[in-house]
């Protein structure tokens, strides 16, 4: 699956069978798909072949970067932002993770003192799953685990 879906920069979201029954990549690419691959695909983003993907995760996909590839479907609050934060954490990019937490949740906290379900003014203004961010903040202050 990794070999079929990685195009040298991004992981394609899915494949479809052609008339002969062969699987062919459909060409759809989403930001969340990159995080799923990074977190659950058994790959090591430090490998040279994933350099461009790593650059996209740490740069192009960053909130407000303005460098986003127009083919990439961006993440939504749940679950995409959380997978982004977890990916940055596991990559050791704690300063980027902290910046993203501030960028995404800062206005929520300033407005209501809570973390919300969505980016905007609909849904829950005190969403339980948003507390996951606290676990990342605590973990980012701990020394790395030794394998």
For the regions a language model picked out, list residue spans one by one:
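Active-site core of glycosidic bond-cleaving carbohydrate-active enzymes
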Residues: 1-147
